[in-house]
């Protein structure tokens, strides 16, 4: 009875233990990785502790692409619907509008940590150590040891006086090919060898091609100054140089002695110079200034000078008498301006007369001012002696003193101002009067 009860319980236990191995429990992959170090396949350090300590974290900045939503678009989608009932029927086609977002490619900067070799180590597993002070000292010790061994080997191979140049007989044949490598030294069991004596020097070889030009050497020091040589013979006379610039004007010399008295000359019949003076406006009724000539009698010595240039043209002559009346002309056209003008308004002729009268007043004032200015200029010219070359004797000759002693100022009658009238032109009042007479 107990056996019957225990048998089903034992079967359940055995079946449960057998089926338990078939279940799979998912574990996260991060739980299986070693925390603190990356995987081996992704360039991470190995499992050994010596390789792990050569890996370090490095901050890396990367630019990665990503999709960013950029608006939306409307799409028309076709939808097919099958028959919902049994039997022959046509498929139904419908359309619907969808609004879906659009994306564009953008770039952003990502900062991440990567496992890389620590400073001073290289290689795929960061096992190779870069050159540093420790390795340099180790290499120096190894080099010193090798140099000491080379010195010991050179001291051990002292040449002994051989009886002949042949090598000693060997009990065992060498393991290398003597003909192929005559000067090779075996690594194991080298055996004693004797150095052969040095042979005679061979003939000199042919001269090789010239080598490339070397770089220029540094500039040498400046040599000592040589002794001064003898003076050479004088050279040939050179060509004359160009003419120099004119020098500055010298100071005027002292006045010379007075010359001898000349023979008395003939008195001239005509006056030698005329000086003009202005009268007061009270002498005339209209207030115009009047020129009064002052005749100066001079007594000069010497021959007369050359003939002067011709003078300016004279003033225009007086207005001639009016001619005989002409034949009556044909009847002229009617002036539209006169016909169309209403009564009481001034005609064009009257307006022109008024404008010319106003203009004549300004011109008359200007003529008066120019007349006075011309009189003053003429007086100054006669005082200086511009129009009379004999009236300005050379200074220092003694004639200027005689001229000043013999000058006599005389006032005469009025002289017509024909020259001034020629310079100033016709009077605008007279001109307007002449024009009115011509029109009549």
UniProtKB/Swiss-Prot annotation:
Q: Where does the EMI domain start and stop, copy by copy?
A: 52-128
- PTM statement from Swiss-Prot or TrEMBL: Hydroxylated on proline residues.
List the source organism.
Mus musculus (Mouse)
Q: How does it assemble?
A: Homotrimer or heterotrimer.
Q: Where is the composition biased (Polar residues)?
A: 269-281
The record's subcellular location field reads: Secreted, Extracellular space, Extracellular matrix
Cystine pairs annotated here are 56-118, 83-89, 117-126
What keywords tag this UniProt record? Collagen, Disulfide bond, Extracellular matrix, Glycoprotein, Hydroxylation, Repeat, Secreted, Signal
Q: Does the keyword Glycosyltransferase apply?
A: no
The name of this protein is: Collagen alpha-1(XXVI) chain
Q: Where is this region: Disordered?
A: 157-362, 390-440
The biased composition feature labelled Pro residues covers 200-215, 231-243, 252-261, 306-327
- The primary location reported for this protein is secreted
Give the UniProt tissue specificity note.
Specifically expressed in the testis and ovary in adult tissues.
């Amino acid at each position: 009875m107990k056996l019957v009860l225990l048998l089903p319980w034992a079967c359940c236990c055995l079946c449960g233990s057998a089926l338990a191995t078939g279940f799979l429990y998912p574990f996260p992959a991060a739980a299986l990785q070693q925390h603190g170090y990356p995987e081996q396949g992704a360039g991470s350090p190995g499992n050994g502790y010596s390789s792990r300590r050569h890996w370090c974290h490095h901050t890396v900045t990367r630019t990665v692409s990503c999709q960013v939503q950029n608006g939306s678009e409307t799409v028309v989608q076709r939808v097919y619907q099958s028959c919902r009932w049994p039997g022959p029927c046509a498929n139904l086609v419908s359309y619907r509008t969808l609004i879906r977002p659009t994306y564009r490619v953008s770039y952003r900067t990502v900062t991440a940590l990567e496992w890389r070799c620590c400073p001073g180590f290289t290689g795929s597993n960061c096992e190779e150590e870069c050159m540093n002070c420790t390795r340099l000292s180790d290499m120096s010790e190894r080099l010193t040891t090798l140099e000491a061994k080379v010195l010991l080997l050179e001291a051990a191979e002292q040449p002994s006086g051989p009886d002949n140049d042949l090598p000693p007989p060997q009990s065992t044949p060498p393991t290398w090919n003597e003909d192929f490598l005559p000067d090779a030294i075996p690594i194991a069991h080298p055996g004693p060898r004797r150095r052969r004596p040095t042979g005679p020097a061979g003939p000199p070889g042919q001269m090789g091609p010239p080598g490339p030009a070397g770089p220029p050497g540094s500039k040498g020091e400046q040599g000592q100054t040589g002794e001064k040589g003898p003076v050479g013979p004088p050279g040939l006379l050179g060509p004359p140089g160009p003419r120099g610039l004119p020098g500055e004007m010298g100071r005027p010399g002292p006045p010379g002695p007075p010359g001898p008295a000349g023979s008395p000359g003939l008195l001239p019949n005509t006056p030698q110079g005329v000086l003009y003076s202005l009268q007061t406006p009270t002498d005339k009724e209209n207030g115009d200034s009047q020129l009064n000539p002052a005749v100066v009698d001079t007594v000069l010595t010497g021959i007369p000078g050359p003939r002067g240039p011709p003078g300016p043209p004279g003033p225009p002559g007086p207005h001639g008498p009016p001619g005989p009346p002409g034949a009556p002309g044909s009847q002229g056209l009617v002036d539209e301006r006169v016909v169309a003008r209403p009564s009481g308004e001034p005609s064009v002729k009257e307006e022109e007369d008024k404008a010319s009268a106003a203009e004549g007043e300004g011109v008359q004032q200007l003529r008066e001012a120019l007349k006075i200015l011309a009189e003053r200029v003429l007086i100054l010219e006669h005082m200086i002696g511009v129009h009379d070359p004999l009236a300005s004797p050379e200074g220092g000759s003694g004639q200027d003193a005689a001229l000043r002693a013999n000058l006599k100022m005389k006032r005469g009658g009025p002289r017509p101002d024909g020259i001034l009238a020629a310079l100033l032109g016709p009077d605008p009042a007279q001109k307007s009067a002449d024009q009115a007479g011509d029109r009549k």
